[in-house]
């Protein structure tokens, strides 16, 4: 915990400075117009932290790699489903990360799953305010938030070729499923930070190794149950990471999750404004986040 606080202090320096900076941006061989280039998502990692054994964990991006690494099929064995698209795979029965592969075996998206038994008994979480994008998986008695990296309506129809996977990597866009029909109920998270201007995405703080945070319709006097479960992260003006959250303390057998500190000072490193309810909510019910990184070496490159 002390190390986490130390790193948080370092992040505060970046938050206070709010200056786009990276130690590699002054490297003489770096591209001068990298900020204008399209994001290239060349990896898929989850988990933020200071422990190298449990943070920035690389995930397989092909079904064959997943099988080699011990991932197993989860639920139905067909690609197209009623409430999501893709062949689902899970590692050691931990629903914190459920990978979705297209019909050809290439990464197509991922889900964060939370078992009902791990949530408050009064069923207050997730709240109606965020249902959807939280969608109930009644077959497994859990709640899911689903993101896709390619168009959902292509995942189980044509999928991607090996050439397309090599060219685009993890994907080209970030889609958030916002209803029960995965092929039609989704929004696309803006790929460029400039496209958030004039929207209800509230700019937050820059935190080194993560990026510039944005939170949907964040307000000081909001109810914490309204906290939107996805927050995008931008570096050099481009989307290259995002986070998922739920307002409860939930376990992850494979150590995927992060547990924010119940402190306004801590939340000020990421949010502006900080909702008044957040410290007490975290003390009473907890808070769980999952960071997802789409480009290599976030420790070195994600400096906003």
Task: Tell where the protein language model's regions lie, with residue ranges.
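Cleavable N-terminal signal peptides of Sec/SRP-targeted secreted and luminal proteins
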Residues: 1-16
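Primary mode marks residue(s) on the alpha4-beta5-alpha5 output face of response regulator receiver
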Residues: 17-304
């Amino acid at each position: 915990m002390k190390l986490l606080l130390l790193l948080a202090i370092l992040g505060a320096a970046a938050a206070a400075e709010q200056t786009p900076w990276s130690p590699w941006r002054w490297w003489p061989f770096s591209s001068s117009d990298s900020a204008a280039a399209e994001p290239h998502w060349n990896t898929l990692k989850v988990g933020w932290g200071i422990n190298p054994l449990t943070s920035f964990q690389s995930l397989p991006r092909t079904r064959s790699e997943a099988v080699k690494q011990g991932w197993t099929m989860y639920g139905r064995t067909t690609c197209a489903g009623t409430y999501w698209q893709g062949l689902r795979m899970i590692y050691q029965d931990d629903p914190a990360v459920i990978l979705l592969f297209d019909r050809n075996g290439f990464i197509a998206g991922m889900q964060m799953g939370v078992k009902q038994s791990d949530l408050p008994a009064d069923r207050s979480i997730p709240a109606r305010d965020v249902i959807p994008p939280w969608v109930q998986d009644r077959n497994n008695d859990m709640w899911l938030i689903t993101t896709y990296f390619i168009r959902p309506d292509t995942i189980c129809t044509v999928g991607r070729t090996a050439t397309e996977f090599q060219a685009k990597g993890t994907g080209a866009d970030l889609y958030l499923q916002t209803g029960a029909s995965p092929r039609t109920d989704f929004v696309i998270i803006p790929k460029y930070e400039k496209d958030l201007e004039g929207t209800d995405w509230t700019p937050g703080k820059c935190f080194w190794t993560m990026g510039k945070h944005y939170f949907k319709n964040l307000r000081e006097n909001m109810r914490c149950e309204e906290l939107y479960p996805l927050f995008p992260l931008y570096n050099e003006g481009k989307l290259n990471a995002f986070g998922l959250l739920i307002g409860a303390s939930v376990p992850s057998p494979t150590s995927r999750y992060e547990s924010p500190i119940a402190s306004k000072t801590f939340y000020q490193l990421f949010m502006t404004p900080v909702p008044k309810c957040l410290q007490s909510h975290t003390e009473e019910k907890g808070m769980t986040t999952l960071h997802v990184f789409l480009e290599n070496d976030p420790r070195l490159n994600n400096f906003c």
